Regions:
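Metal-dependent de-N-acetylase/amidase catalytic core
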Residues: 1-15, 87-239
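Active-site rim/loop-helix segments in enzyme catalytic domains that contact anionic ligands
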Residues: 1-102, 224, 234-239
Length: 239
């Protein structure tokens, strides 16, 4: 597990509130990006230590296994308190430093529409850090300014109306294997604490089927972008 400031440069930076959030939402897209030669770095914001299942050490081991299975370049952690993420200068500067170290073209972060307060806070934190990271005179000691050109948001515990849906049918089985690395979050004997009554693997499967059906495929991952995305070549839209 790398510290945020020592993360390597990459094409894609994925911000997850807790270990497993990035994989549940994005593993298929990340597998496809890497097939296309894109370098991916994962950055968890907390260690998930306040969750109902799994210790911080167990979840760290699961996150490392998932990262290896996914084949990403590196995985880091901001070390902010689980259930206590705040959008303050300290957290902002940690994330600004990470963005300037990784220097991604694409940033993936959680959508603010969520029942978990950490997800909402991380969404707001990402928005703030994304902007400030590009300012030349903001905390220059954190590195040269850099603002990811594309910033996509992914859903957590609530559905979103997506701007785009990525067809992940070709890698759906690989994604399922990655998500199953989070063994402490699978098949709990008591489901009363689960927001939607589903464990992480079940939630990923059902959501991918739902959004996949919306574009006529077996599995899809949804993303939201603030404003229209430019399309310079219409031909790929024809299939």
């Amino acid at each position: 597990m790398s510290s945020p400031s020592s993360l390597p440069t990459a094409d894609v930076l994925v911000l997850g509130p807790h270990p497993d959030d990035s994989e549940i939402a994005n593993a298929g897209t990340l597998l496809l990006l890497q097939r296309a030669g894109q370098r991916v770095v994962l950055l968890d914001v907390t260690r998930g230590e306040k969750g109902s299942r799994g210790t911080a050490a167990e979840r760290a081991a699961e996150a490392a296994a998932a990262a290896q299975q996914l084949g990403v370049l590196a995985r880091g952690n901001l070390g902010l308190p689980d259930t206590g993420v705040r959008v303050d200068d300290h957290a902002t500067d940690l994330l600004v430093g990470a963005m300037r170290a990784v220097r991604p073209t694409l940033l993936l972060g959680p959508h603010a529409q969520d029942v978990h307060p950490d997800h909402t806070a991380v969404a707001q934190l990402a928005e703030r850090a994304w902007f400030l990271a590009g300012l030349r005179n903001y905390q220059p000691q954190l590195g040269a300014p850099h603002r990811p050109r594309v910033f996509l948001r992914y859903p957590g515990n609530r559905p979103i109306e997506p701007t785009l849906v990525v067809d992940i049918t070709a890698v759906a089985d690989q994604k399922a294997a990655v998500v199953r690395c989070f063994r402490s979050q699978l098949n709990p004997p008591d489901r009363a604490h689960l927001v939607l009554g589903l464990d992480v693997a079940e939630r990923a499967l059902v959501r991918d089927q739902f959004y996949g059906a919306r574009i006529g495929v077996r599995a899809g991952e949804p993303f939201w972008h603030d404003g229209p995305l430019p399309v310079r070549d219409v031909a790929p839209l024809l299939g």
